[in-house]
Amino acid sequence: MSEAEARPTNFIRQIIDEDLASGKHTTVHTRFPPEPNGYLHIGHAKSICLNFGIAQDYKGQCNLRFDDTNPVKEDIEYVESIKNDVEWLGFHWSGNVRYSSDYFDQLHAYAIELINKGLAYVDELTPEQIREYRGTLTQPGKNSPYRDRSVEENLALFEKMRAGGFEEGKACLRAKIDMASPFIVMRDPVLYRIKFAEHHQTGNKWCIYPMYDFTHCISDALEGITHSLCTLEFQDNRRLYDWVLDNITISVHPRQYEFSRLNLEYTVMSKRKLNLLVTDKHVEGWDDPRMPTISGLRRRGYTAASIREFCKRIGVTKQDNTIEMASLESCIREDLNENAPRAMAVIDPVKLVIENYQGEGEMVTMPNHPNKPEMGSRQVPFSGEIWIDRADFREEANKQYKRLVLGKEVRLRNAYVIKAERVEKDAEGNITTIFCTYDADTLSKDPADGRKVKGVIHWVSAAHALPVEIRLYDRLFSVPNPGAADDFLSVINPESLVIKQGFAEPSLKDAVAGKAFQFEREGYFCLDSRHSTAEKPVFNRTVGLRDTWAKVGE
């Protein structure tokens, strides 16, 4: 992590500063507690940067704890991917990876303590009846007929639950709080439910599993967390967080603070919707470069530094808002403009023949970065037959068109000035070859007679060209807020992936996955980690040179 990434400020850091100044805490201990039931997305990156960033800046600790209380939906695959994402973003957790399941014995003991205090009971209402009895925002709930069981009966029934004596959905343990509470979360919430499923950490030791709200606060306390940071949807849950800790015998009582979650235009963050995109094969997987997952962004070519910078720029507030996709794209564009070496690739190729060029070819010198001589230069082969992009030639054009036109001149990047003389077309009228002449005395210099040549286009020597597949990725949805659509799948952008067969300069045969290039005049690209082969490299467009959606939105 670069020291240059300046320390941000926000309301949470102000709270921490006050806590340290008052002596309430002498150190800072945070945690990042994902559930291992899916891949992390850009919204999680905000929480990662906040929790790990605070620990880093205050020289404290941040735990990575997996909230693994639902074995039905969780998998070790997600555990490993989450660990990889956190490390890739540039952060390191304190000590060993932790799991909520590490505390199942203590959690069970605390549940028994609540039963002994008359603060928890075994309920045999069905899940549907529990929802019905809970009431609404405008109507109070009503007590379960099982609410007033004795402590002894509840202890026996809870042990029966643990021993597998009830079927799933036939019994649960509930907190005994207040069914008339204005906060629905406090209307006797479920603390334990039955699930006959093998757990990826504990195997078949348990058939009862604690709920998130019971587990989360106790895990925080057992780990000595000082500041428990959650998104705003858990604001009401803070009352239950405090109630549990106030009513069990535990020496540490962390405080929960809420911040706004990250909402991003032109995508969805809901795990259910992301899963639907994958299972219905609208995308090729969780790491599809159009997905907002960290693995998808990484495969597309986003850098960890650009994501950290994005999270820093959007800040941490209590107000929900939706961030423009252009803000995220701006961060990676700035990063790669500064750091990505340049290369030439022709995405929509058409053959160009220089009729007066003599010899088999030559090498021309090109800088790897126009503003960074320390990045060096490379030798690129040039010959009398080259590929140029079809969009860089017109038979006729107005003065605003600064590329190649019949009868006019243009410069080939770091090479010669050429003039278009004639074209050859196929039976359908498509141009197949452009025939040109060149000025042999203009290699990387102006014409001797002083004539001005304004346009510059890129090229690839046909004899040396590397055949490449180029995947032009764009925004996955065609509207800014796809989640608001009646059917979010109906607003998938049909142009979110366009595949082209093109040619690249031969140096790109040594490209490695994860290393970005600016394809001159085209955008920023990286080698695809999944589909590339030695015979046929595949390059993903990370982002264009400029925001082409700005005009679309106007």
Swiss-Prot record:
Residues bound to ATP are 35-37, 41-47, 231, 261-262, 269-271
SUPFAM superfamilies reported for this sequence: Nucleotidylyl transferase, Ribosomal protein L25-like
Q: Where in the cell is it found?
A: Cytoplasm
Its Enzyme Commission number(s) read 6.1.1.18
Subunit and interaction comment: Monomer.
- Which InterPro entries does its entry note? aa-tRNA-synth_I_CS (IPR001412), Gln-tRNA-synth (IPR004514), Gln/Glu-tRNA_Ligase (IPR050132), Gln_tRNA_ligase_bac (IPR022861), Glu/Gln-tRNA-synth (IPR000924), Glu/Gln-tRNA-synth_Ib_cat-dom (IPR020058), Glu/Gln-tRNA-synth_Ib_codon-bd (IPR020059), Glu_tRNA_lig_a-bdl (IPR020061)
State the organism of origin.
Shigella boydii serotype 18 (strain CDC 3083-94 / BS512)
Keyword hit for Aminoacyl-tRNA synthetase? yes
Q: What class of enzyme is it?
A: ligase
Q: Name one GO cellular component term.
A: cytosol
Drop me one GO molecular function for this one. Answer: glutamine-tRNA ligase activity
List residues binding L-glutamine: 67, 212
Q: Which Pfam families match?
A: tRNA-synt_1c, tRNA-synt_1c_C, tRNA-synt_1c_C2
* Protein name per its UniProtKB record: Glutamine--tRNA ligase
Q: Which GO terms describe its biological process?
A: glutaminyl-tRNA aminoacylation; glutamyl-tRNA aminoacylation
Keyword tags:
Aminoacyl-tRNA synthetase, ATP-binding, Cytoplasm, Ligase, Nucleotide-binding, Protein biosynthesis
Where would I look for the motif 'HIGH' region in this sequence? 34-44
Q: Where is this region: Interaction with tRNA?
A: 317-324
User: Coordinates of motif 'KMSKS' region in the sequence?
Assistant: 268-272
Q: Which family does it belong to?
A: Belongs to the class-I aminoacyl-tRNA synthetase family.
Catalysed transformations (reactions): tRNA(Gln) + L-glutamine + ATP = L-glutaminyl-tRNA(Gln) + AMP + diphosphate
